[in-house]
Amino acid sequence: MSNVLPTYPRSGLQFTHGKGCYLYDEKGNEYLDFGSGIAVNSLGYSHPYLNTRLKEQLEKLWHLSNVYKIPEQEKLAQRLCEVSFADYVFFCNSGTEAIEASIKIARRYFHQTLKSKTKNEIISFTGSFHGRTLGALAAGGFSKLNTFNTTIEGFTQIDFA
């Protein structure tokens, strides 16, 4: 029996390592990684340059709160703004955190910038998956996952055509 909370049925596959875009199980079978950690690990596995940079960073800092200035974070934010439309970057730990932040940013914009207390509706697609927080579940309208008998108001789901 596993001590990992069973949030969904798990596959019998057990991967031991990865290289490039491939995963390997305990028997040495090779699998092309189409899942990418549910679409969050698109960099592949064991790339020499990334391994070197990650090892260098491990010798410096692992994690700091964003209440502190972090030189590497500042450099990356500047670069992202230089090559995009954005003036600011909000770094997140996960897609779910990004969804929660986008919900808050959109609602804050309407409440503060447009001075509207009624414009808070967010449109999303039915059956979409945005994570497992209450806000992400409400945005997705994926009732199969929302077993908490609660929802957050202000979302309109439309069919994806």
Regions found by a protein language model. Give the residues of each.
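PLP-dependent aspartate aminotransferase-fold enzymes
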Residues: 78-161
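N-terminal glycine-rich, Lys/His-bearing helix-loop that initiates the first secondary-structure elements
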Residues: 1-88
